[in-house]
Swiss-Prot record:
Pfam families: SMC_N. Gene3D superfamilies: P-loop containing nucleotide triphosphate hydrolases (3.40.50.300). It comes from Invertebrate iridescent virus 3. Belongs to the IIV-6 050L family. InterPro entries: P-loop_NTPase (IPR027417), RecF/RecN/SMC_N (IPR003395). This is Uncharacterized protein 094L. Transmembrane segments: none annotated. Signal peptide: none annotated.
Amino acid sequence: MKLTLKNFKCYTSATFNFALDSTTLITGPSGQGKSTILLAVQFALFGMTGHRYVISHNKSSCEVVLEYRDFWIKRTKRPNVLLVRWKGQAYQDDEAQVVLHRWFGTTANCSTFFLDLSHVEKMEFLERIANATYNVGELKARVKAHLSTLSRDLAVLDGQIATSNEMAAFVEKPDPIPEPNRDLVEESLRDATQEQVEEVRRQTLRLRSCEVEKSNKHATLQAQRGEIEHELRLLGPANDTVATQIATLEESVARLKAQADQLQADKEARILMEDQSSRLTQYDSVSEAAVSERVERVEQLNRAIADAVTMEQLWELDREQQTAARLLEQERHEWRERLDQAQVELDHIAAELGPDQDGCPEVEQRCHEYWHAKSFNSDHNLPQLKEEMVQIRARLYKPICCTQCHHKMLVNMATWEVKDGDDGPICATTGSGEKGRLQADRKRLQQLETLMGQINHNEAVMASTPIDELTARLQLYRDRETVRERIRQMQTFQPSASLAALEHKIKTNVHFKRKSKSTIALVPLLESVESLRERKCTAVVQLDLMKQQLAAKDKLERQLAHYPSSVVHYSEEAHRSSLDELEVCVGQLADKRLEADRVRTIRRLEAKRAKLQTKLDELNHCPEDLTRHESKLREVNVALEYWARVTEYQSYCARLDKWNQFHASLRDARDRRERMEKQYRTTVTFSRMVCEAEHESLQCVVSVVNSHLEILLQDFFPDCCGDPIQIQLELCHDKQRPQVSATINYKGNRVDYKSLSTGEYARVKLAFDLTFKEILGETIIMLDECTANLDQDLSTKIFQKIISTFPSKTILVVAHQAVAGIFNHVLTL
């Protein structure tokens, strides 16, 4: 079995190998991760642990890979993914978990001692074991839901039947209605259906409505024509020359408006010109000479800044050369010390090895033979091989009975050896294919004998090999090679990366230093570069401001030169006279437009009167048509009255049918209630049987737990007589759930488990854990500090009992103090 951990609690990356079907002790100092290994196996198989945080610190995810026989299991957290490969098939997530439960059992998933649980929690725990293959709770819920549905349906049916019975007292058979007479209908409508009669009525109503609408429209048009003639009399005659007068006035107004707009624009331009003239006087002190002087001052500051920067770079280069020389001397001294120290280590290892300086290949060969022999023996179970040899040898004997004395004998079919029939068991069989079976058994027996010889040879090799001494000597050989390699690497001095980079920088700047020293003397600076740059910034700002002022002055001079003469000679009196003349023309134009509106109104009314007269002529109104339609409508109403009586007669027939259907539905509801009541009684009986079956399964589980506890506790408590612990299932009345109570008989007294000592309590808890692990079918048994409170002798007896109880399972035990000899393998962290 191979376990690989990545970012799981205290393990960033680790791999552990465990032998199958054997017992492994995991020991080591506290905090080294012993319990984490068991937790990782539980996480890989079942995905649930009692720990909330399983991811390593400052990591975002973890991964556990478990290889067990044909299984390859990988479970990750963030993302939560389970992947299982078994016999060439791949399974994932829920499907993979089902496969793991089938082959590795289920886990109790309970971090609390069984006796510390409440009655409800104990029952839930035992129910999970008893009902592992079937969800009894879901079945009971379905039965309960079905009973609730039946009760609700019965209540609904009872209500319906009661309501129907009450309604039956009020619902009476309808009174008979005579069939209507068709002869009362007009002969032209007698053969028509109700829809046809209604269609005739709609057509008649539409025609009558059209005649009424035509009459109303004729009256409305007459009234509108009278109103128009009255308005024309009030407006009087129309003036046809008003249009020419309006055109003349509009031309005058347009000319005066253009003149007024031009004068207003000249006025605004005159105000802007005066403002620009006043602003121009502010730039009298700005000139080209002043700008040139500022430019020369900025160039002087630039030259001073360049000289200061070059001087600072030269000083910095001198400081770096001094630092490089000091670092070179320091690193050479450290290199000599490390070389001397490595030579001392090599001499010390040579002294420990002694005269045999070249025996490394022989030591490696002997260690390899030892570990190969140990691995071969751990992979083969010696008791199982012996038992198989005994069984094969027993199968080689065939029973023969003497026909004269009836004496039973056994004949070895391979060697023809004869022995008494009472010596040992008879496992041979007769029938077809016996010869082939005997050949296979002889061949298998030879293989087992060869395998036993190899195992005995390996035991002899392991006994004659001092593995600890050889391992220590092999480590010395390896340390010697490591030190020699380190000395070979340190033969030549290599400067550090920072020193090499500093020397490269100095070599790169040598040409710059020579050129700078030839032009500038290396003297202290009178003024810093920052101060010079601040002065330059101030001078540049003043230069930019002066350039902006000079540009603004030129712009104002150009703008003043482009103003027209009308702006220069603008007159306020001429502007006011033009506005007064425009106001007079606008008033006259408004009066003429009112006169034009009156003329248009007269023309519009005359056109409307002519249109109304045309509509009256087209209407062609005739009052006799309305009387004819009224007479036709009365005949149609008589026919519709006949059809109304027909509808009433049909309603009577429908009510009679409903009355008959009501009584039929009442009889059907009573029949359905009888059938549903029978189904309800059957379901109640089934629910009672489910509860009884569940109780019997719990009794069976408790009996199995008691039998396992009895066997374990007799070995865990050798000084106790009788059964130390027994679980009894007590039932309350039918409407409550059964409860579990535990009684402890220890040394002839009935006591509470909390009054036991720490060691006694640990043994009781271990017995419960092993019992549930065996019942749940766990393939890998994991025990974490289960004997921490027990002495060495009792711990040894308990571990021997555990090993004998689970001979064909992989057992992982975490313990600080235990006899390592009783375990097949020991893993020290």
